[in-house]
């Protein structure tokens, strides 16, 4: 509880879940997604393709237990050739089913630029202007502590990451975190049974 209070205070969020049982960033993202999406909901990525490791979680590549298998649909809007957001396409792809928007801060294995906190804030403001109740989640892996503010300071409802990377200083062998609104980090997210189930992904 003390460590989670420190994370919530550090990232200026209402709540935090920080556990060694969350084995890595992909596991933390899977836990956050599966705890906040239900059959009939839609997941939108407005910054292009996510990490390869998330493709089976989402169901872009067929996988047992994926979001797609449970009736969650997925839409993706690629960045424009100059790396800017395709606001017109994003607007077109937000609909009554859009429940969660995932924003990957790092460029990962893509050639696009890594997103600054300022740009993430602008994107979230645009999305919330269209659908205020949508959950905006930021994959914060590799982005922690490289700026004076975090995505949680500019409107992100959840930020998710790995303890193996920046927060662990290269020393932590395992662990992950989810920081954000209490409504996004509910009892289901904290369920040890649910966490164990996701360790197989």
Spans of features found by a protein language model:
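Active-site-flanking structural segment that lines cofactor/substrate pockets
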Residues: 1-17
């Amino acid at each position: 509880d003390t460590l989670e209070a420190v994370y919530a205070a550090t990232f200026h969020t209402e709540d935090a879940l920080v556990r060694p049982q969350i084995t890595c960033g992909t596991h933390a993202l899977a836990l956050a997604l599966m705890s906040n999406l239900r059959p009939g909901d839609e997941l939108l990525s407005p910054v292009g393709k996510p990490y390869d490791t998330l493709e089976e979680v989402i169901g872009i590549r067929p996988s047992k237990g994926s979001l797609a298998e449970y009736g969650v649909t997925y839409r993706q809007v690629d960045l424009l050739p100059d790396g800017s957001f395709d606001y017109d396409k994003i607007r077109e792809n937000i609909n009554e089913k859009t429940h969660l928007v995932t924003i990957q801060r790092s460029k990962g294995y893509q050639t696009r630029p890594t997103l600054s906190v300022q740009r993430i804030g602008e994107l979230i403001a645009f999305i919330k202007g269209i659908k205020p109740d949508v959950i905006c989640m930021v994959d914060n892996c590799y982005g922690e502590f490289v700026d004076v503010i975090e995505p949680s300071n500019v409107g992100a409802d959840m930020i998710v990451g790995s303890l193996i990377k920046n927060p662990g200083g290269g020393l932590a062998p395992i662990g992950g975190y989810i920081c954000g609104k209490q409504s996004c980090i509910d009892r289901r997210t904290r369920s040890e049974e649910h966490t164990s189930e996701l360790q197989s992904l």
